[in-house]
């Protein structure tokens, strides 16, 4: 189980990312449309003004049940060992263990 502080920190980053998403997207669009290099630098400075934690690259996908940030499966939202336990206990419909 991940520490509660890390989970709350991740939730805070998600809120910040949603808040500044439109600003980042519009700034990037402006940079691609303007041919002047000096104007691009000004817009690039504006792009750096939002908080660092509002960048989408700083977000991690976390396990739904344990909060583990690594080895997550997108389709289920679970980490690898929890996914394996749930499949073995038949708690995930449609998921089967492979055998060949």
Curated annotation (Swiss-Prot):
Keyword set, alphabetical order: Chloroplast, Plastid, Ribonucleoprotein, Ribosomal protein, RNA-binding, rRNA-binding
GO molecular function, one term: structural constituent of ribosome
Repressor in keyword set: no
Any one of the GO CC terms: chloroplast
Record localization: Plastid, Chloroplast
One biological process term in Gene Ontology: translation
InterPro entries linked: Ribosomal_uS14, Ribosomal_uS14_bac/plastid, Ribosomal_uS14_CS
Domain of life: Eukaryota
Subunit text: Part of the 30S ribosomal subunit.
Family annotation (NCBIfam families): PRK08881.1
Protein task: Binds 16S rRNA, required for the assembly of 30S particles.
Family the entry assigns: Belongs to the universal ribosomal protein uS14 family.
Descriptive protein name: Small ribosomal subunit protein uS14c
